[in-house]
């Protein structure tokens, strides 16, 4: 639930974009910049939140993150200037949600599960994206008629409601409740340490080692494109884009909800395929198809049938890139550094999402249309696929095991 609320808070900026524009008269680029900053901090805080979980504990880090999210969004109810929105929904909520991001799932998995770690982490990752998209129609319903305060209040109360549950119901270690990690042999064996950075300096050191390898930059760059084409563009601007074509916010949010449902299927299937096929080939297919679909979207008739087909197709590919990216990180950076390196690769994802969240709004403000933004993003998807194909042909890389 904490992961869901954190991701849901970040996706809420897409719901309130048009209502804020109508209520305050702020331009689309200004509103988009705040969404971009929040997305960027959401990713950047992750590696350092892992260090905080090691020093003060998972529960305290969660409480701090949820408290900051609740306070910053609640305070925004009284905002009157763009910088109020930037501070509350960009800076403060970005930091707070970053402390309760995917790194939390990884920390809990490593501390509480000795076996089935991949399955549990996959479920947490998929359900976070799926859940956030599923609840968007309700938030869009609250924003009918240009209302934005009911949406903000709902998100704030959701963050606040979780605080007592975390404070009283989240043990720090399995031993605190007289048990051991799931699947652990020997009931008194201590839990294994988290695979994230224990200190900020260790996170930086892992980044320095990884940056010397071309594979890091390839994965960082392609994950940049992943964020650019999902959270940043579709997640932030699809509702507004559909509004330009006369589609009501609730119906547009329903498309995101449908994507969320099929994301669960696509991500699970991607994990199964990653265990059996070369992850580089999978990434080539995922990025190539995603890019072509984004290029095609602006030229559809925006009827119910065409948008439904797009939502299903795009939902299957929403975060299907995560399992093969993690697999390549494990193969190239080793068991010790791979989780930390993936945390930095995920920063690239959020950088791409931030670039699209701001850039698409700027393009819409300058041209009056989202068409160039979707075509450009689609082009980046195709380029990412071609770079992966070039890497596969020039570099043999570690052997990929096949059953």
Model-derived features: where do they sit?
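Hydrophobic core of transmembrane alpha-helices in multi-pass small-molecule transporters
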Residues: 4, 72, 84-99, 224-225, ...
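Extracytoplasmic gate region of multi-pass secondary transporters
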Residues: 13-17, 208-267
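Intracellular juxtamembrane helix-capping segments at the cytosolic ends
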Residues: 20, 99-113, 320-333
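Interfacial helix-cap and linker-helix signal at transmembrane-aqueous boundaries
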Residues: 20-21, 52-53, 134, 138-146, ...
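Helix-to-loop junctions at the C-terminal end of transmembrane segments
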Residues: 45-58, 267-278, 364-365
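C-terminal ends and interior cores of transmembrane alpha-helices
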Residues: 67-80, 289-302
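Cytoplasmic helix-loop-helix junction between adjacent transmembrane helices
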Residues: 89-126
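Helix-loop-helix hairpin linking two adjacent transmembrane segments in secondary transporters
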Residues: 124-175
């Amino acid at each position: 639930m904490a992961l869901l609320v954190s991701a849901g808070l970040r996706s809420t900026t897409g719901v309130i974009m048009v209502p804020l524009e109508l209520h305050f008269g702020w331009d689309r680029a200004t509103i988009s910049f705040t969404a971009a900053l929040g997305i960027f901090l959401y990713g950047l805080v992750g590696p350092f939140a892992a260090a905080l979980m090691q020093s003060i504990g998972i529960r305290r880090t969660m409480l701090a993150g949820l408290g900051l999210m609740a306070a910053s969004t609640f305070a925004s109810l009284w905002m009157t200037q763009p910088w109020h929105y930037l501070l509350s929904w960009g800076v403060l909520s970005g930091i707070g949600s970053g402390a309760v991001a995917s790194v939390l799932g990884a920390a809990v998995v490593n501390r509480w599960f000795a076996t089935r770690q991949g399955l549990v982490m996959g479920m947490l990752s998929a359900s976070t994206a799926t859940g956030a998209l599923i609840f968007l129609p309700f938030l869009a319903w609250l924003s009918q008629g240009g209302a934005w305060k009911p949406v903000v209040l709902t998100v704030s109360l959701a963050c606040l409601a979780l605080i007592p549950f975390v404070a009283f119901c989240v043990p720090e270690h399995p031993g605190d409740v007289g048990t051991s990690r799931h699947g652990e042999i020997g009931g008194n064996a201590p839990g294994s340490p988290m695979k994230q950075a224990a200190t900020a300096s260790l996170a930086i050191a892992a980044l320095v080692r990884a940056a010397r390898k071309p594979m890091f930059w390839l994965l960082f760059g392609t994950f940049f494109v992943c964020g650019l084409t999902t959270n940043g563009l579709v997640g932030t601007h699809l509702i507004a884009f559909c509004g330009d074509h006369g589609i009501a916010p609730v119906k547009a949010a329903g498309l995101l909800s449908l994507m969320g449902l099929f994301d669960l299927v696509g991500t699970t299937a991607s994990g199964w395929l990653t265990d059996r096929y070369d992850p580089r080939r999978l990434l080539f297919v995922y990025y190539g198809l995603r890019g072509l679909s984004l290029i095609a979207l602006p030229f559809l008739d925006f009827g119910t049938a065409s948008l439904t087909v797009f939502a299903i197709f795009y939902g299957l590919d929403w975060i299907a890139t995560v399992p093969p990216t993690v697999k390549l990180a494990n193969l190239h950076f080793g068991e010790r550094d791979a989780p930390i390196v993936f945390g930095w690769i995920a920063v690239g994802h959020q950088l791409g999402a931030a670039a699209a969240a701001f850039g698409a709004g700027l393009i819409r403000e300058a041209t009056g249309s989202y068409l160039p933004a979707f075509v450009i993003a689609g082009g980046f998807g195709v380029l990412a696929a071609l770079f992966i194909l070039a890497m596969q042909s020039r570099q043999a890389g570690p052997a990929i095991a096949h059953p």
